[in-house]
């Protein structure tokens, strides 16, 4: 039997999966997130987390690193060649062997596209858009936060939600039902100082995640109710998402019809975002005159690692 390991390293968690040569997932473990951009120790700290997970998976299955034919790591935050190279240096120091490192955005294509060709658009903790074209060329768009104009991820939505409420309460600019939803869900009054108290929650590690999640939840509740300010944000998200997707069509070779687009990340797969996703598809096709097949990833992204390794005969 041949063994392979797939690593899906995200901002909040990292999954390590052991596969055989028939694509069967034999076992899996999880650790904390391994995105170096979120860690005080940067890439060395991320390498420590990754190796701890790999070693835990090996130990659990009575295997050694030399028993593994190949390991494919798909890691959030690996956006530049220099980051890739530094990560490899750190992993080599820690005894890693026979492995490849890519940005995590690429494995969703290998996991969700029936032929391994397509565009993957991820909106989760962050945003990135990756593709593998008909020639096997790989391209990444976005992933650099405000520098690249990323929209649609959880932190961005939470920020936009707070801003709309701020505009209503503090600027008296536009009424939004988000204000009433915030009053209800956070137990605050629709007053300036009460709203600003949420900033302390966003800066508190113990409360930050739940506060962001609540802001996201009330945002989609307002969208479902047709709240005009919230719908304005949805239109921004869809327009920017369409621009990201079409950047791949313009810069790569997709001489197929329709073009596969795999949507991944919690905003696309775990939240009631149908209104947004429908508008995203509509704008993508309207701006390009092309047909696209949009699918939401319904399997663990880490399965894209084994598909990729066997497709490319890594370790063969």
Predicted segments, located by residue:
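ATP-binding/phosphotransfer module of carbohydrate and carboxylate kinases, centering on a glycine-rich
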Residues: 1-67, 90, 112-117, 163-316
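Phosphate-binding/catalytic loop of phosphoryl-transfer enzymes
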Residues: 78-175
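Flexible, active-site-adjacent loop/turn segments at secondary-structure boundaries
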Residues: 76, 145-146, 197, 265
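Structural motif
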Residues: 74, 102, 295-297
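Glycine-rich beta-strand-to-loop/alpha-helix junction loops that act as flexible
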Residues: 72-78, 123-126, 259-270
């Amino acid at each position: 039997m041949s063994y392979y390991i797939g690593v899906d390293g995200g901002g909040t968690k990292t999954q390590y999966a052991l596969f055989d040569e028939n694509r069967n997932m034999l076992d899996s473990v999880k650790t904390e997130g391994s995105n170096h951009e979120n860690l005080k120790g940067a890439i060395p700290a991320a390498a420590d987390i990754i190796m701890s997970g790999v070693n835990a998976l090996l130990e659990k299955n009575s295997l050694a690193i030399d028993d593994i034919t190949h390991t494919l790591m798909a890691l959030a935050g690996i956006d530049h060649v220099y980051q890739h190279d530094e990560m490899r240096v750190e992993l080599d120091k820690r005894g890693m062997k026979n492995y490849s490192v890519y940005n995590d955005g690429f494995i969703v294509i290998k996991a969700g596209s029936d032929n391994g060709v397509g565009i993957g658009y991820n909106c989760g903790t962050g945003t990135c858009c990756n593709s593998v074209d008909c020639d096997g060329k790989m391209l990444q768009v976005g992933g650099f936060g405000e520098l690249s104009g990323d929209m649609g991820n959880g932190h961005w939505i939470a920020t936009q939600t707070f801003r709309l409420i701020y505009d209503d309460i503090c600027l008296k600019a536009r009424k939004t039902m988000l204000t009433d939803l915030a009053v209800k869900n956070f137990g605050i009054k629709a007053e300036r100082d009460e709203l600003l108290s949420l900033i302390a929650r966003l800066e508190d590690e113990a409360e930050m995640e739940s506060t962001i999640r609540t802001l996201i939840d009330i945002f989609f509740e307002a969208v479902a109710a047709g709240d005009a300010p919230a719908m304005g944000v949805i239109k921004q998200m869809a327009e920017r998402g369409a621009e990201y997707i079409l950047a791949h069509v313009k810069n790569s070779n997709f001489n197929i019809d329709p073009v596969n687009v795999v949507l991944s990340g919690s905003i696309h797969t775990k939240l009631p975002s149908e209104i947004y996703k429908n508008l995203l598809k509509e704008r993508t096709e309207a701006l390009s005159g092309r047909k696209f097949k949009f699918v939401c990833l319904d399997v663990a992204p880490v399965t894209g690692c084994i598909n990729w390794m066997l497709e490319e005969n890594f370790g063969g």
